[in-house]
């Protein structure tokens, strides 16, 4: 276990649980956990934080993928095709992540956070509206493999936060899936991106395993709670919490970066 204060450890456990909670409902749990790791380990090499984040995320994402697969019809062949490309893309992204410094990583994460915040604010119906459906053509599948697979997979391995949300958006727009189908497919693809990146981080020895195991337990618990709360209160409640949390994280990261 890294040498950290009890307060920092508690903060990370809460962030891991909250990340699992949000991931289970709307995706984007990495938007909480990775910034929290950056705040908890401001002088640590970012590659170790990225690798630890992946080790935690794959546990909650796998559980969510199983849940979605049981409750929603999923085109497994399509998900596997996109997932295979995503695995390759994420492994490549993780390879380049070793050279990223915290001075570069913080502004990038802030940009991602602001982009997601703008989308959530401008699209308050996200998660409740019903996108148009249509036939999945070979061309659309190819675009999905390129964008959701290689492109977002590379981003997930390189940085990570927001990948689940980006996957849902891309799959909905490109394949014209409804939101439930897109979420189900995204979870399967996200497991592949997490696995590809985690293997690369593990090979490079940039995973804090003892910390990851502890945080994974809280992430899994948060995901279980999130699934049940989503059924009771709806995704609008979680989106509100996400907006408040993202604003707070952007403010703190900006303070650490420039003040």
Indicate residue ranges for each PLM-predicted region:
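Transmembrane helix exit motif
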Residues: 63-73, 94, 110-136, 248-259
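Small-residue-rich segments of transmembrane alpha-helices in multi-pass membrane proteins
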Residues: 39-43, 85-91, 116, 139-154, ...
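Alpha-helical transmembrane segments in multi-pass membrane proteins
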Residues: 11-15, 19, 23, 34, ...
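Transmembrane helix-loop junction
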Residues: 39-40, 94, 98, 107, ...
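Helix-coil boundary and interhelical linker segments in multi-pass alpha-helical membrane proteins
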Residues: 1-9, 39-48, 95-104, 202-210, ...
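Selective hydrophobic functional segments
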Residues: 51-104, 108, 194-244
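Selected transmembrane alpha-helices and immediately adjacent juxtamembrane segments
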Residues: 1-45, 131-183
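Residues within membrane-spanning alpha-helices of integral membrane proteins
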Residues: 9, 54, 110-113, 117, ...
């Amino acid at each position: 276990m890294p040498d950290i204060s009890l307060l920092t450890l508690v903060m990370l456990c809460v962030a891991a649980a909250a990340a699992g909670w949000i991931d289970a409902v709307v995706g984007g749990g990495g938007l909480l956990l990775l910034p929290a790791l950056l705040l908890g380990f401001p002088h640590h090499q970012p590659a170790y934080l990225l690798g630890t984040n992946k080790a935690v995320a794959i546990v909650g994402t796998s559980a969510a993928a199983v849940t979605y697969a049981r409750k929603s019809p999923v085109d497994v062949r399509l998900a596997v095709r996109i997932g295979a490309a995503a695995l390759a893309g994420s492994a490549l992204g993780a390879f380049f992540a070793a050279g990223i410094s915290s001075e570069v990583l913080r502004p990038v994460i802030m940009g991602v956070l602001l982009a997601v915040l703008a989308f959530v604010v401008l699209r308050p119906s996200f998660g409740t509206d019903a996108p148009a459906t249509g036939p999945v053509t070979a061309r659309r599948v190819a675009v999905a493999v390129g964008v959701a697979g290689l492109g977002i997979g590379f981003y997930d391995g390189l940085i990570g936060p927001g990948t689940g949300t980006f996957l849902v958006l891309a799959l909905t727009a490109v394949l014209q899936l409804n939101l439930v189908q897109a979420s189900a497919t995204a979870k399967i693809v996200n497991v592949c991106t997490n696995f590809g990146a985690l293997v690369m981080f593990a090979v490079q020895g940039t995973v804090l395993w003892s910390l990851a195991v502890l945080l994974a337990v809280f992430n899994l618990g948060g995901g279980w709670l999130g699934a049940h709360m989503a059924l009771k209160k709806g995704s609008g409640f979680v989106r509100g919490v996400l907006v408040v949390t993202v604003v707070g994280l952007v403010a703190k990261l900006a303070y650490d970066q420039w003040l």
